[in-house]
Amino acid sequence: TMARRIVSAGSLILLTAGALLIPTSAASAAERDGVCDVGEVCLYYNSNGEGSLSDFSGSIPNYGGSQPNCYEFKGPGNGQGKCVKNNAASVWNRTGRSVTIYYNSNHSGPSQTIPDGEPVNLRPELKNENASHEINDNVKLCVNGNCPV
């Protein structure tokens, strides 16, 4: 009957409209979520990319020395919740550019430049002695882990 067709069509319209209102999850990487995504530099609490990690998509002039005013390790594992400053032992650079880790705040003092795509342990003078990092925007994009310095 005509009334049945109208009800069926109305139900279909409501069902379609309802489906459009269901939220979808974002597929993009989220900084500071404890996951080392492409486009980020990740500092790890332990050597060899182990333990909790802290992920960044930009340069940080000062990690901050104590809670609640510090960047902290976010991922699961040893060190989770601790401040990054003077606690990082290894780095995985996934930014597409070289990243320099500094002993002092404000990008100064002894440093180590990490090429893109290369997870590395920090040198002894920077292991657990790090206060800032800089993503080197003035350096050409790295290719297959090779960064012009």
Predicted regions and their residues:
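Compact beta-sheet-dominated domain cores in extracellular/mature segments
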Residues: 3-13, 17-149
